[in-house]
Amino acid sequence: TEEYNGSTWTAGGNLASGRGYGAACGTQTAGLIFCGNPSPNRNTTEEYDGSSWTAGGNLGTPREFNAGAGTQTAALTMGGNIPGIATTEEYNGTSWTAGGNLGTARYTAAGAGIQTAALLAGGTGDTDGTELYDGTSWTTSANMSLARKYFGAAGSQAEAIAFATQSPVSGSTEEFTLGSPAIRTITTT
């Protein structure tokens, strides 16, 4: 774990179990990481208090290559696995329960927002599609100008950014704004 103070990175507490291809959300002093590889981690959660990690509740569906959004006590995991799955789960700080199913099963997507107002973008098959969550169900939204997988996203359901991608590697960034026009490319490299 590394923590950023606005200008430099410093070491934080180590995870109890190393993992890759999972999802995370929260803040520097209240973080959450869930799922990933190797296989014993595919349904586990760890919570960060700013100095150390402790075990949280286990997910109902083991996943990797999933996306996350929300806070440590109100998180959302979306999709994941190969081939992609359409299920989501919601975390209340103690346990995970089933959420609404995505319109499109996907993995390697990125999420932003909170548990009751989330955005999921890109993923499986180099998709450019986005979906919005209202805490109950998902609806299709605007397409990005570039299909993305293995990329990052940040922000809220109403205002988010998607940055970088793999295959081909790109440093492009797109800005999502709920409304019209919904997607705007702000940099392409």
Regions found by a protein language model. Give the residues of each.
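Polar, enzyme-active/binding microenvironments
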Residues: 1-189
